[in-house]
């Protein structure tokens, strides 16, 4: 009996060992990086549908090197149209196209473990399987055009399904765009959820903190939303801002709202100003309650009250602050208090928002490591001297791990309606705008100055040391050692492509990916693609270019920044995950050898 158990166990271990060996020798997954989507849902959906220009590159990798760019473009166009058409220049018939498509699919599916048969629609699944296996198929497949055309349709569908294995989003679904909800629904949908890795951005932290119940972040979230007149977003999320709107329009005359308010509607402008004042009052309370944050320089209301009291308002562009008590400027008026308390409760209990943010709290992280890459939104806090900056007793990887624990705990309390810790809620405020936050990276967020001070020099928000340090070999080596990685991928900071700036450092260790989805950055958005053969950046098309390309059924114009090329396709065994799998394989092999030794001893006895 013992011998039978031993043999059964050897069989189980052998199967596990073979699965690990297969995975180790599989190609790394083709991965897309995108960052800073900034609420631009339609543009994101459009570019995602086109797979960020990956179709041409995949066809190029999967087909013989003798194929001209024109021939590859012709085949890619058929995939997009899902329909064969003749081209006198290329002289390829339906059979030629079918065999090329099979070759592309075989390239993507060979040495890959993360595929399943769902990439094929059921009608031609068996036929495609035979073609991939090199088995004969019935003659009508090639001889009857109506059947060939349907097969080309199904092959085109399958090719689009296998273009992309993983999507790494580097944060900031929220900001100035009106459709963050659309983006989250796409990323969390059954079609994409299992292939998405998400790291938080500072604007995500803002909304997450507001939903958890941080008072100042509730005011700030709504202030930014009103600043861009995104009332449809608030309506879709079922927020009731009628009381706020009535108070704002009654309290703040539009002609007196002369600060740098951006809302285009009178209603939005009044609400923006009302929320700005409420936000500053709530921030002052939090900063005073948590002096160890060292943010006392952000306390402006005492100074504002003194200006208003003495009439020395020449530095200001706006002096209409009817709800500020000059003797106690950070005190909320009775009506402000009632309004913000109602809004806080709406944020905490809003089921529509909770459905969206569940994806962040449960699936998101402060950083993510894959294929020897560290993925972060903005930075790892560092000092002028190139050391890791300490915050609350933590630094480097330990700091990001600590923040992750707080976010996860806060998220669980939020999702299951449990009481929150005041310290945890306050931390979200610091993560949003504190100088040592891994999501921000500047010495201060100058919201007050930009709204109300005439002197533009005081509006400047100076970046700290991350960008400079990431140009230093010593700091890059420090990052590699701290996280056990080879490259660092980060977003948050736009890369000005129009001025000739590059995404990657010369050695390819530091790569700055910013999707440029905010309207101000439409001409400098980037994505990053890693295939088993290449690592390259894509300069994304503008919305106008996307529309014109869709009409012509052609790819939008893309510029490529090649970062690295690999003579042999990269395998899982070449990655950090592969090293862990190799350790697991060695343990299993040790057990198998132990059982084998026991069997030999048993035979001898």
Swiss-Prot record:
Keyword Transcription regulation: no
Highest taxon of the lineage: Bacteria
SUPFAM superfamilies, A to Z: Metallo-dependent phosphatases (SSF56300)
Reaction(s) catalysed (UniProt annotation): beta-D-fructose 1,6-bisphosphate + H2O = beta-D-fructose 6-phosphate + phosphate
Gene3D superfamilies from the UniProt entry: 3.60.21.10
One GO BP annotation of this record: gluconeogenesis
Keyword GTP-binding: no
GO molecular function per UniProt: fructose 1,6-bisphosphate 1-phosphatase activity
EC number: 3.1.3.11
Database matches in InterPro entries: FBPtase_class3 (IPR009164), Metallo-depent_PP-like (IPR029052)
Keyword annotations from UniProtKB, A to Z: Carbohydrate metabolism, Hydrolase, Manganese
Cofactor dependency: Mn(2+)
UniProt pathway annotation: Carbohydrate biosynthesis; gluconeogenesis
HAMAP family linked to this entry: FBPase_class3 (MF_01854)
Similarity comment: Belongs to the FBPase class 3 family.
Name by which UniProt lists this protein: Fructose-1,6-bisphosphatase class 3
UniProt lineage: Bacteria, Pseudomonadati, Thermodesulfobacteriota, Desulfobulbia, Desulfobulbales
């Amino acid at each position: 009996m013992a011998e039978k158990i031993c043999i059964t166990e050897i069989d189980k271990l052998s199967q596990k060992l073979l699965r690990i060996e297969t995975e180790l020798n599989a190609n790394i997954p083709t991965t897309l990086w995108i960052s800073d989507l900034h609420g631009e849902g339609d543009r994101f959906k459009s570019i995602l549908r086109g797979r960020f220009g990956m179709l041409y590159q995949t066809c190029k990798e999967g087909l013989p090197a003798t194929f001209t760019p024109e021939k590859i473009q012709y085949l890619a166009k058929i995939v997009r149209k899902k329909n064969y058409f003749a081209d006198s220049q290329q002289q390829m018939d339906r059979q030629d196209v079918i065999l090329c498509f099979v070759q592309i699919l075989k390239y993507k599916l060979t040495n890959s473990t993360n595929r399943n048969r769902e990439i094929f629609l059921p009608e031609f699944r068996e036929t495609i399987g035979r073609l991939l296996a090199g088995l004969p198929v019935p003659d009508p497949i090639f001889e009857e055009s109506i059947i060939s055309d349907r097969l080309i349709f199904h092959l085109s569908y399958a090719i689009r399904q296998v273009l992309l294995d993983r999507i790494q989003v580097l944060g900031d679904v929220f900001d100035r765009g009106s459709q963050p909800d659309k983006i989250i629904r796409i990323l969390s949908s059954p079609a994409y959820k299992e292939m998405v890795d998400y790291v938080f951005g500072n604007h995500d932290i803002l909304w997450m903190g507001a939903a958890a119940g941080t008072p100042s972040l509730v005011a700030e979230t709504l202030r930014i939303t009103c600043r861009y007149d995104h009332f449809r977003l608030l309506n879709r999320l079922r927020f009731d801002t009628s009381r706020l709107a009535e108070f704002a329009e009654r309290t703040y005359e539009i002609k007196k709202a002369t600060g740098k308010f951006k809302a285009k509607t009178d209603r939005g402008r009044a609400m923006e100003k009302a929320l700005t004042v409420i936000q500053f009052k709530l921030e002052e309370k939090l900063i005073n309650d948590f002096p160890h944050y060292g943010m006392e320089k952000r306390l402006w209301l005492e100074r504002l009250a003194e200006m208003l009291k003495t009439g020395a308002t020449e530095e200001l562009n706006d002096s209409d602050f009817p709800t500020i008590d000059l003797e106690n400027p950070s005190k909320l008026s009775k009506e402000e208090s009632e309004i913000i308390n109602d809004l806080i409760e709406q944020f905490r209990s809003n089921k529509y928002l909770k459905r969206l943010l569940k994806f962040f709290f449960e699936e998101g992280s402060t950083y993510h490591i894959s294929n020897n890459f560290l993925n972060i939104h903005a930075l790892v806090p560092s000092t002028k001297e190139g050391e890791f900056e300490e915050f609350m007793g933590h630094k480097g990887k330990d700091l990001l791990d600590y923040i992750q624990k707080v976010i996860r705990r806060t998220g669980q309390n939020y999702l299951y309606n449990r009481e929150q810790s005041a310290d945890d809620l306050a931390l979200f405020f610091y993560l949003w705008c504190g100088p040592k936050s891994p999501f921000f990276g500047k010495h201060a967020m100058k919201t007050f100055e930009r709204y109300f001070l005439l002197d533009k020099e005081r509006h400047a928000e100076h970046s700290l040391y991350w960008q400079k340090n990431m140009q230093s070999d010593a700091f890059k080596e420090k990052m590699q050692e701290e996280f056990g990685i080879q490259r660092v991928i980060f977003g948050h900071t736009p890369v000005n492509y129009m001025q000739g700036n590059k995404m990657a450092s010369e050695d390819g260790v530091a790569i700055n990916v910013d999707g440029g989805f905010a309207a101000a950055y439409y001409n400098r958005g980037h994505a990053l693609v890693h295939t088993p053969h290449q690592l390259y950046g894509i300069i994304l098309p503008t919305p106008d270019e996307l529309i014109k390309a869709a009409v012509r059924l052609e790819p939008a114009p893309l510029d490529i920044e090649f970062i690295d090329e690999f003579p042999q396709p990269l395998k899982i065994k070449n990655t950090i995950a592969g090293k862990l799998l190799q350790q697991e394989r060695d343990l299993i092999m040790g057990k198998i050898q132990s059982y084998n030794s026991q069997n030999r001893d048993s035979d001898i006895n």
